[in-house]
From Swiss-Prot:
Compartments, record wording: Cell inner membrane
Record-linked InterPro entries: ATP_synth_OSCP/delta_N_sf (IPR026015), ATPase_OSCP/d_CS (IPR020781), ATPase_OSCP/dsu (IPR000711)
Name of the coding gene: atpH
GO CC, alphabetical: plasma membrane; proton-transporting ATP synthase complex
Protein known as: ATP synthase subunit delta
Taxonomy of the source species: Bacteria, Bacillati, Cyanobacteriota, Cyanophyceae, Gloeobacterales
PROSITE patterns the UniProt entry points to: ATPASE_DELTA
Length: 185
């Protein structure tokens, strides 16, 4: 348990260092946000990529070569140097939590709230805009970042996650509540 907490703290420190580097030049804050988002996407789409970086018996030179092949010309040169530094310090296994922590730091700096919406069917742009506006009013955020996911098993409605708060307005959730009420009465 302690090792997980230590890793989390180390990842947070690396993300803070990345933020400090980003603040040193105009435009890097957003650029690094795009870079970390892209890296998270690559890790989501290719679990083998992340596994390759995590395995300790793979040579550091091979890990650096993979990073250059995957991200060279796609991320800012400072970011590529940062990734290679993580390899040198044997911290590249923390790439995902570092990227996630940086994204969280960036949202805080930009006063942006992250909301995840899981719906039974894809939301239209009008529905998404209306939802963003309601979340903005509810949280007093300057901006709202809406991540959408479709789960047909919800049957209808949606589940909205804003930070630690979960609003279950799905048909499946309503049926579950009704079933619970009927069994308790």
């Amino acid at each position: 348990m302690q090792q997980g907490k230590d890793s989390e703290q180390i990842a947070q420190r690396y993300a803070e260092a990345l933020k400090e580097l980003a603040l040193s030049e105009t435009g890097l804050l957003e650029q690094f946000g795009n870079d970390t988002d892209g890296m998270l996407q690559v890790m989501e789409e290719s679990p083998d990529f992340e596994r390759f970086l995590v395995v300790p018996i793979i040579a550091m030179a091979d890990k650096k070569r993979l990073l250059v092949e995957a991200f060279g010309g796609k991320v800012h040169p400072y970011m590529l140097n940062f990734l290679q530094l993580m390899v040198d310090r044997r911290r590249i296994a923390l790439l995902r939590p570092v990227c996630t922590s940086y994204q969280r730091i960036l949202r805080e700096l930009q006063q942006t709230t992250l909301a995840e919406v899981i719906s039974a069917v894809p939301l239209s742009e009008e529905q998404a805009s209306a939802l963003i506006e309601r979340i903005r009013r509810r949280t007093a955020a300057v901006r709202v970042e809406l991540r959408r996911r479709v789960d047909p098993e919800l049957l209808g409605g949606m589940i909205i996650k804003i930070g630690d708060e979960v609003i279950d307005a799905s048909l499946r959730g309503q049926l579950r509540k009704l079933t619970l009420q009927l069994t308790l009465s």
